[in-house]
């Protein structure tokens, strides 16, 4: 019934508004982590997030007091977000690659939170944008890559569904993300309870190999362990970080 309900635009948006009224967030405890880290770092009240769903995105908990920029290439999700989210959130429909990121630099004078979850070129986008010096970085890591220091190869038309490997070939490992952030003065500050999302600040001190967590959702729907997931993708092309 709910699936049918979501196919009808007015009903879907009414449903979304009802969820927003109750409070929305990320897949796990991302919202609580970001609120805590933003307070601890004295972050400017601005966020930029790309790769989002209208009622499920990491920075949703910040909407009440932050100005935000949300970016995605899905036209339906963009239209829904514009219809249901508050006016302090700017919403842009764009397919991003390494050559068209400059508008992000111009969004705010200072960025409090930068959140990246695009199921593909996450590492390469973060590498390109680290010089904007956000107070807090939230980025998806791929737990199927275990404690290896690797990323998928940059592909401007990256489509996780078309890459194979049961959708487990995307992004970069937590160790690789941590190395990249460390080179710019950031340390690992938190990992979400459900796995997959990592948070970096200038004062983070966690060891990525011990802080790593598997994806609870991935294990649940696939019935596999992270080691089995790695066996599925290990022969695909990688960049060692």
What kind of region is each of these model predictions?
Residues 2-13:
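Short hydrophobic helices that act as membrane-entry/anchoring signals
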Residues 12, 16-48, 55-58, 101-104, ...:
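Rossmann-like AdoMet/SAM-dependent catalytic core
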Residues 22-107, 116, 120-123, 143-146:
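SAM cofactor-binding core of SAM-dependent methyltransferases
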Residues 62-63, 129-133:
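Short, conserved loop/helix-junction motifs that constitute active-site signature segments
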Residues 66, 133-135, 186:
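A short helix->loop->beta-strand "cap" motif at the edges of active sites that frequently abuts
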Residues 109-115, 136:
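Short SAM/SAH-binding signature in class I
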Residues 134-143:
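Conserved beta-strand signature within the Rossmann-like core of class I S-adenosyl-L-methionine
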């Amino acid at each position: 019934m709910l699936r049918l309900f979501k196919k009808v635009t007015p009903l879907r948006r009414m449903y979304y508004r009802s969820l927003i009224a109750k409070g929305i967030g990320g897949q796990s405890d991302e919202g609580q982590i970001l609120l805590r880290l933003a307070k601890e770092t004295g972050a400017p009240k601005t966020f930029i997030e790309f790769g989002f769903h209208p009622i499920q995105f990491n920075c949703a908990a910040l909407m009440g007091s932050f100005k935000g920029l949300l970016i995605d290439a899905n036209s339906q999700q963009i239209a829904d977000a514009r219809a249901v989210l508050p006016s302090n959130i700017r919403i842009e429909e764009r397919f991003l690659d390494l050559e068209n990121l400059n508008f992000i630099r111009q969004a705010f004078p200072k960025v409090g939170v930068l959140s990246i979850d695009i199921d593909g070129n996450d590492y390469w986008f973060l590498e390109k944008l680290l010089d904007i010096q956000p107070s807090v970085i939230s980025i998806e890591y791929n737990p199927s890559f275990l404690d290896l220091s690797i990323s998928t190869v940059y592909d401007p038309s990256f489509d996780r569904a078309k890459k194979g490997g049961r959708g487990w070939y995307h992004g970069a490992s937590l160790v690789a993300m941590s190395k990249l952030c460390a080179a710019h003065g950031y340390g690992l500050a938190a990992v979400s309870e459900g796995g997959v999302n990592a948070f970096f600040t200038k004062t983070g001190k966690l060891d990525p190999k011990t802080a790593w967590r598997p994806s609870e959702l991935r294990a649940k729907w696939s019935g596999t362990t992270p080691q089995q997931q790695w066996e599925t993708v290990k022969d695909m092309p990688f960049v060692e970080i």
